[in-house]
């Protein structure tokens, strides 16, 4: 019978072989907080950046963001574009749904004059454009909205009742095989937005699945499940959504973390709300009763007033954010993220 030392040697050899064959980060201990040296782009949500473990979405990788309708998928990707533009990166938006609203994008902080936009006629055209942009090496972030709208040419040209079983899945599988190595070489972040469908006849387990077959689930380095879990009200008026994002797959840091944040209508992700919560948790901001204070100075009664103070004092807000980012990215396990169980085989599931 093998001794513990021999078992450890065998395990180290196996892990070394796996990393050699599949790349660093293909396997790690679940509690391992060591982050890979990968360039990342902020998502616009401080809490989500921490949950991802490397400070944002990884460059040179494929990312899938999926969820129900009106859950904040496009808002999150536009927020990524806004953050990427702040660092001088070139962005492209492949709008297969033909639903991009430039006015809404500008409200989220996107400089609408700069991003490249394409509204392709079919799925093949969309993925060819994506491939050409990646191969150019000049585009840093590409958003494909959405996989469900990547309709194969044969389906568009066919009659309404024709059967095209598995056509979209084959298209995605072929495209991702071509794209993966090019994306890595170009150090380009490609984000696919995806929708949810219900599997028919599922008696046990989760009936939800994403469109476009299984290829994207395998090729994506990060998969984010985004859900609306509540409403934000000001009096009787609904002014935004409480949003929850679960990292169901992560090949660059430990997965299965989740985070809550607010999306305000016409403004996007509320950074001030996250800064207040994290600031209180890590004692940068003090709270006594309903009052919030920063450096012994009262900044507001109630969270709404404290958030307003941060908006009116951007220098202090920036200092609080940079202090928290430096501290928490070094120890992401102490952040406002909760590790949750992987509920289904592919990580898709309802939140508990």
From Swiss-Prot:
Record CDD domains: RecA
The keyword Iron is annotated on this UniProt entry: no
Binding site for ATP: 67-74
Top-level division of the source organism's lineage: Bacteria
Keyword vocabulary terms for this entry: ATP-binding, Cytoplasm, DNA damage, DNA recombination, DNA repair, DNA-binding, Nucleotide-binding, SOS response
Localization (cell): Cytoplasm
Gene Ontology terms, MF aspect: ATP binding; ATP hydrolysis activity; ATP-dependent DNA damage sensor activity; damaged DNA binding; single-stranded DNA binding
GO cellular component terms attached to this protein's record: cytosol
Pfam families: RecA, RecA_C
Any one GO biological process: SOS response
Main function: Can catalyze the hydrolysis of ATP in the presence of single-stranded DNA, the ATP-dependent uptake of single-stranded DNA by duplex DNA, and the ATP-dependent hybridization of homologous single-stranded DNAs. It interacts with LexA causing its activation and leading to its autocatalytic cleavage.
Family: Belongs to the RecA family.
This protein's name: Protein RecA
Species assigned in the record: Aggregatibacter actinomycetemcomitans
Gene of this entry: recA
């Amino acid at each position: 019978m093998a001794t513990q030392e021999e078992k450890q040697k065998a395990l180290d050899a196996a892990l070394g072989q796996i990393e050699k064959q599949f790349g660093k980060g293909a396997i790690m201990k679940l509690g391992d907080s060591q982050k890979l040296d990968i360039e990342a782009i902020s998502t616009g949500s401080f809490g989500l950046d921490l949950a991802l473990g490397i400070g944002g979405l990884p460059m040179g990788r494929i990312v899938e963001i999926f969820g129900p309708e009106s859950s904040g998928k496009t808002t999150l990707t536009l927020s990524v574009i806004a953050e990427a533009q702040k660092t001088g990166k070139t962005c492209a938006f492949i709008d297969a749904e033909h639903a991009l609203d430039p006015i809404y994008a500008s409200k989220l902080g996107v400089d609408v004059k700069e991003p490249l936009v394409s509204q392709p006629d079919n799925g093949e055209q969309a993925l060819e454009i994506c491939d050409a942009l990646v191969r150019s090496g000049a585009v840093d972030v590409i958003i494909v909205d959405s996989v469900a709208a990547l309709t194969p040419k044969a389906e568009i040209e066919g009659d309404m009742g024709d059967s095209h079983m598995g056509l979209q899945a084959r298209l995605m599988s072929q495209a991702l095989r071509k794209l993966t190595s090019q994306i890595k070489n170009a150090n380009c972040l490609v984000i696919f937005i995806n929708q949810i469908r219900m599997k028919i006849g599922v008696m046990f387990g989760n009936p939800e699945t994403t469109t476009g077959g299984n290829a994207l689930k395998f090729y994506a380095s990060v998969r984010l499940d985004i859900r609306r879990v509540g409403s934000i009200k000001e009096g009787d008026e609904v002014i935004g959504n409480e949003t929850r994002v679960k990292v169901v797959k992560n090949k660059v840091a430990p997965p299965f973390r989740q985070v809550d944040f607010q999306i305000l209508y016409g403004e996007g992700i509320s950074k001030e709300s996250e800064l207040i919560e994290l600031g209180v948790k890590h004692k940068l901001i003090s709270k006594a009763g309903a009052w919030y204070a920063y450096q012994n100075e009262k900044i507001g009664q109630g969270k709404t007033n404290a958030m307003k103070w941060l908006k009116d004092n951007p220098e202090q807000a920036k200092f609080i954010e940079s202090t928290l980012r430096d501290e928490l990215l070094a120890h992401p396990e102490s952040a406002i993220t909760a590790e949750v169980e992987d509920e289904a085989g592919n990580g898709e599931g309802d939140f508990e």
